[in-house]
Amino acid sequence: WSGKYLDDFNDRETLDIQLNVFEKFEPVLPDAQKDSRFVLLGNIHPGLQAHVLDQLVAEDAFVAVDTIDLWITTAKPAFLELLKRVDFLVINDSESELLTGESNIIKAGAALRQLGPDKVVIKKGAHGAYFFYENGLFALPAYPVTELRDPTGAGDTFLGAVMGMLAALNKTDIDSIKQALFYGTAV
């Protein structure tokens, strides 16, 4: 992936994507990972994410998914099918608008939950994140920084830290997710 960030670093423009090894990649989970309780489907084609999900045997797995605008625009039907199978969607505000057509973040969060995942986080970069869940909304600030050089990978780091904290807590209740979100923001 290559792209450029706009002046405020909150929005980006994708300039080029080279799939390279992912063009013919077929992920195979090792037997020891098939019963994982915490699963993060990283940003790859939704068909590959579904292929990973198909290999899981743990019925109580807490499954989070990440994506980018490329998959929303080029593989939207596959991504919408995948959303019916996951517990936790974490995307940024421009991706949420692209997926739902809603520019209002509150309406977008509700619309995303209707697509399947019970829990949704919409990231707003330097402006924090919004966590949507049944009968609730939780807004949290971003970790304050005075100088931002390059936000590439910040969302991946955030979600990885959130899922790592949930796995360490071995819980997925709302309070634990809120705690993990604060942790992810600080990382």
Question: What kind of feature is each model-predicted range?
Answer:
Residues 1-40, 54-60:
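Conserved N-terminal subdomain of the carbohydrate kinase-like
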Residues 19-24, 67-73:
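Short gly/ser/thr-rich secondary-structure transition/capping motifs
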Residues 25, 48-49, 75, 105:
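Amphipathic coiled-coil/heptad-repeat helices and related helical stalk/stem segments
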Residues 29, 79, 148:
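Acidic, amphipathic alpha-helical patches
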Residues 43-48, 68-72:
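Short beta->alpha connector loops
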Residues 54-62, 69-141:
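Conserved phosphate/ATP/ADP-binding segment of small-molecule kinases
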Residues 105-187:
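Conserved phosphate-binding/catalytic region of the ribokinase-like
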